[in-house]
Amino acid sequence: MSQNLSAQNSSETPRIKVAIIYGGRSSEHSVSCVSAGAIMAHLDPQRYEVFPVGITHDGVWTVGESDPSRLKTVDRVMPEVQFTREVSLSVNPTTAGELCFEDGSLYAKVDVVFPVLHGRFGEDGTIQGLFELSGVPYVGTGVLSSACGMDKEFTKKLMAAEGLPVGKEVILRGSETLTEEHKRELGLPVFVKPARGGSSIGISRVADWSEWDAALSLAREHDSKVIVEAEIVGVEVECGVLERIDGSLMASVPAQLQDTDEGDEGFYGFDTKYLDDVVTAHIPAPFDAETTALIQELSLKAFTALSCRGLARVDFFVTDHGPVLNEINTMPGFTPISMYPQVFEATGIGYAQLLDNLIEQALHK
């Protein structure tokens, strides 16, 4: 694949104009910034012309940071979008891909958008709807699949409907709380999560019901809908899925996350993922061939069940009785320590080649 891509990279071929959109209104704003910086650093400047677009915490679109080195975590401080000059994307299909300043002058007319946005208002189908209205090609999954993938309730319902193995959970809406019957069914420990969140933000592990109120309050700070999951005893595993340019799918080697029981959170939390300078996974996971093949097969089935496009990362617990699906991430992290680029590197597809595939797939879908 890399030979075919490089063959197109001749001096007379115009560069592909790519808008990298990052930041956003979600609690994963800073993770998105780091992902965007890593992507910009790996895009071949001979092949791509990059136009960064940042979205502030307040949702304002602005000309983004063009220096990837300024979108890194330094001394445990993560970057944020800094406002410079407001821009907006045309929603008129006759001017598809036009990014304009407030005075109507053109910032760029791009060929494709790479929305490196994590969490709500970026990974949940909202911005994908904007791209559909605009008519501009974009990397990743469409409106419905993004919305379902973002919402853990509907992810699990779709997985279960396809006969895929999922764990026990209870959904709480509004002011609802667990009943005594729920508590008996779930047992302890349980994990309390915002239903539409990621990067382990707002998640608590409850080992005693005296911890319940605090855990529920924390989750509701991030979402009015909360999912309470029975703990699954097993190792955490992540597997990447990539849609090739011809539409065929491939699954990466799986990664096994290191045991985090000794940590303060008791699970694979935000600090472990993004701030602590530690090795967090065994890649490839040390499973036998049969277990590895089953994880890859289930990852592809999950991707298809949600009608995903382009890419996804599928998370599992592997128990003594086999893999159990946990969730699917339709725009996984692309930070230097994110699992998605790492598992494909171990599969034989480097970071730059991975980006080439995703952009080409978006342009031809």
From Swiss-Prot:
Pathway involvement of the protein, from the record: Cell wall biogenesis; peptidoglycan biosynthesis
Binding site for ATP: 183-238
GO BP of this protein: cell wall organization; peptidoglycan biosynthetic process; regulation of cell shape
Pfam families assigned to the protein according to its UniProt record, in alphabetical order: Dala_Dala_lig_C (PF07478), Dala_Dala_lig_N (PF01820)
EC number(s) per entry: 6.3.2.4
Catalyses which reaction(s): 2 D-alanine + ATP = D-alanyl-D-alanine + ADP + phosphate + H(+)
Listed name of the protein: D-alanine--D-alanine ligase
Origin species: Corynebacterium diphtheriae (strain ATCC 700971 / NCTC 13129 / Biotype gravis)
